[in-house]
């Protein structure tokens, strides 16, 4: 579960390395974001000559959470850390590569571009 002030790794090559959630989109009092949800992030750490700079405020899709993800068949999936992919205003990823596995729950949330770029879908 991602909430305000949560630090996340960036799972793409947009130039950001670490981001901090500053807002969970989808309702005035919405507190938590899960896999596939869109959040507003502030870039806390970035590489030189990247597409995004430190201090930029961008939208991002949560692709991995450390909290258990319950599936309909009763199975549970869990990741080692929290990660997000930075997106533009058209909900397309800013980077051209995705690093690490992503869950198939992203497919149900219509983030097909992220699923197709990912090296592994769990």
Swiss-Prot record:
One of its GO terms (cellular component) is cytosolic large ribosomal subunit. It comes from the Bacteria. One of its GO terms (biological process) is translation. Transmembrane segments: none annotated. The keyword Ribosomal protein applies. SUPFAM superfamilies: Ribosomal protein L14 (SSF50193). Gene3D superfamilies: Ribosomal protein L14. The keyword Ribosomal protein applies. GO terms for molecular function: large ribosomal subunit rRNA binding; structural constituent of ribosome. Pfam families: Ribosomal_L14. Part of the 50S ribosomal subunit. Forms a cluster with proteins L3 and L19. In the 70S ribosome, L14 and L19 interact and together make contacts with the 16S rRNA in bridges B5 and B8. Belongs to the universal ribosomal protein uL14 family. This is Large ribosomal subunit protein uL14.
């Amino acid at each position: 579960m991602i909430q305000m002030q949560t630090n996340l790794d960036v799972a793409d090559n947009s130039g950001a390395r670490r981001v901090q959630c500053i807002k969970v989109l989808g309702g005035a009092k919405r507190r938590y974001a899960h896999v596939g949800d869109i959040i507003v992030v502030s870039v806390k750490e970035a590489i030189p000559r990247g597409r995004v700079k430190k201090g930029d405020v961008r939208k991002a899709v949560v692709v991995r959470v450390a909290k258990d993800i319950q599936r309909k068949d009763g199975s549970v999936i869990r990741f080692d850390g929290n990660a997000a992919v930075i997106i533009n205003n058209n909900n397309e990823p800013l980077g051209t590569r995705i690093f690490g596995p992503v869950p198939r729950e992203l497919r149900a949330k219509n983030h097909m571009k992220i699923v197709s770029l990912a090296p592994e879908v769990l």
